[in-house]
């Protein structure tokens, strides 16, 4: 019986040696393709499904796809880059032009022809929820975009200090343009028609709150003074 046990031990040892000496097969899984997600220059959410930025380039397109954009508002006299036009066409994104100065050309100073009509045109697109998700953009995403967003904040009932602070946040070390801030301050919020039933929920809520808190100025007749 001892010999049988010894034989079993020898067989076990041999089997173990074979197991250790057997070549190990490694399954190599190729790495997943790496896709860089880069937001456009000065990109920032404004409200739910409303965004702002500078002009998107091809490197930003994968990022934009994640937003499921329905509309892009382009604030400039010139057309955007061909790549952006093709991207919008390929993904069925509506591109709305809101020319700063419709009579000006590519070399025209945009601030010479800044009109309330151009701003109202952009805002009329923003206040309708069927255009969302929506991106507002211009060349750098600073002054032109900041003007439209600033006027939107006025409609929402923001005070001027808060509007100016948000505008300057995107203007960089040079600071804001006094012309822009004066235009935002003087903007007639009643020039934009808002249908609350078709407006984004956050806008309808803000407008209702602003209207509820509005206190008309007290007027006096000559006889009361």
From Swiss-Prot:
Organism lineage string = Eukaryota, Fungi, Dikarya, Ascomycota, Saccharomycotina
Point out the signal peptide segment: none
Q: Which GO terms describe its cellular component?
A: cytoplasm
In its UniProt entry, the species of origin is given as Eremothecium gossypii (strain ATCC 10895 / CBS 109.51 / FGSC 9923 / NRRL Y-1056) (Yeast)
Q: Where is this region: Disordered?
A: 1-24
* Name of the featured protein: Putative tyrosine-protein phosphatase OCA1
Q: What class of enzyme is it?
A: hydrolase
Biased composition annotated in UniProt, kind: Polar residues: 12-24
* GO biological process per UniProt: cellular response to oxidative stress
Q: Which family does it belong to?
A: Belongs to the protein-tyrosine phosphatase family.
In terms of superkingdom, the source organism counts as Eukaryota
Q: Which GO terms describe its molecular function?
A: phosphatase activity; protein tyrosine phosphatase activity
Write down the Pfam families for this protein, in alphabetical order. Answer: Y_phosphatase2 (PF03162)
Its Enzyme Commission number(s) read 3.1.3.48
> Which catalytic residues are annotated?
138
List the keywords (alphabetical): Cytoplasm, Hydrolase, Protein phosphatase, Stress response
């Amino acid at each position: 019986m001892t010999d049988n046990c010894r034989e079993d031990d020898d067989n076990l040892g041999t089997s173990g040696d074979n197991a250790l000496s057997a070549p190990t097969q490694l399954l190599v899984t190729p790495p997943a393709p790496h896709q860089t997600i880069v937001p456009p220059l000065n990109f920032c959410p404004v409200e739910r499904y409303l965004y702002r930025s500078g002009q998107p380039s091809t490197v930003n397109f994968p990022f934009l796809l994640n937003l499921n954009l329905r509309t892009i508002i382009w604030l400039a006299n010139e057309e955007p880059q061909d790549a952006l036009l093709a991207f919008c066409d390929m993904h069925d994104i509506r591109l709305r032009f809101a020319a700063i100065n419709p009579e000006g050309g590519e070399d025209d100073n945009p601030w010479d022809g800044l009109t309330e009509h151009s701003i109202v045109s952009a805002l009329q697109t923003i206040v309708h929820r069927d255009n969302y998700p929506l991106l507002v953009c211009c060349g750098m995403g600073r002054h032109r975009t900041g003007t439209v967003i600033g006027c939107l904040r006025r409609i929402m009932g923001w005070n001027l200090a808060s509007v100016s602070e948000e505008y300057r946040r995107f203007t960089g070390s040079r600071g804001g343009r006094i012309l822009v801030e004066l235009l935002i301050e003087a903007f007639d919020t009643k020039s934009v028609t808002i249908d609350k039933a078709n407006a984004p929920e956050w806008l309808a809520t803000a407008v209702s709150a602003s209207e509820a808190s509005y206190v008309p100025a007290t007027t006096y007749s000559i006889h009361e003074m």
